[in-house]
Amino acid sequence: MARQFDTLDSDALRYHSEGRPGKIGIEPTKPAQTQQDLALAYSPGVAAPARAIAADPADAYRYTGKGNLVAVVSNGSAVLGLGNIGPLAAKPVMEGKSMLFKRFAGIDAFDIEVDETDPEKIIGVVKAIAPTFGGINLEDIKAPECFRIDERLRAELDIPVIHDDQHGTAIIVSAAVINGAKIAGKEVAKLRVVVNGAGAAAIACARMFLTLGIPRGQIVLCDSRGVVTRYREGLTPQKEEFATSRRLASLAEALHGADLFVGVSVADALTPSMVRTMAENPMVLALANPDPEIAYGAAMRSRPDIIFATGRSDYPNQVTNVLGFPFLFRGALDVRAAPINDAMN
């Protein structure tokens, strides 16, 4: 296994460094070959659209690329599977996100890495650059700060804002749960659910499960300290939403008889013995990246009736936000939706 990941690492480093470094670039959308082209593109012709936009800001969507441009904003404080690696180390991830916007939805995206941890300052930065963009994609900002940043920007900006770790993950995981339940022959509303991880993605998934009809009492949330219960002190408001009254101490205890495991946490958090205690036809969504909560081979060997998915593209049943966020933003940009609400999700 170590050799496999060593090979993947070397391949990835070569992929990113060969030719022009990185994964995104800028290409002109209008001709710039002649003196007349340049006169129209910049001085003096550019004054005409500038005056039009000053008179009517909506004309920015007619004369500029604003309506097809998204900012991918991160401070690198909570990169899935990598943790707090900071803004510079997060840049390859955000460039990758920008590339996926272009590849799957034709959306231009700039990665904006912000060297800041104060939520109010991040909010200020995003609001200051918002006139440039048709939408804002918040990415890999740690909880609980991310909740405040997301809520404020969604309320205060007139363009669509998505914290993809929350809303994008919840959409795709919910789709996987609906389809997995069909395969397992189970009703979604009767699923007994364990979510491992209590950050932005976990809370958003749990909230979305409520909209699918799963009762709050059937959802157990686990974090690095074990099961999130009502008897624990110091819970964040978001964790309090899903604190269980059941006397459970560990992930292993919570999984006894569970129908669904959703992992948005860390590698190796789940063991084959835990999987074997789950209900018939268990759904295991091990979504930590780059390494899932349980390795693919170990999961498949744990029991023959498992329905297993990861966040990786090199294994079957990939559950990844790329199945959702490009198309959600495509629709939101096309109709200038703000904000993006639960019904759209």
What are these regions (language model features)?
Residues 6-11, 280, 336-345:
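Glycine-rich phosphate/adenylate-binding loop
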Residues 240-307, 312-316:
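Rossmann-like adenosine-cofactor binding region
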Residues 111, 137-140, 161-164, 195, ...:
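General beta-strand structural signal in soluble alpha/beta enzymes
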Residues 1-159:
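N-terminal ligand-binding/catalytic initiation module
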Residues 80, 87-105, 163, 167, ...:
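Glycine-rich phosphate/diphosphate-binding loop of Rossmann-like nucleotide-binding domains
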Residues 61-66, 102-103, 128-130, 154-155, ...:
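Solvent-exposed alpha-helices and their adjacent loops that cap or buttress functional pockets
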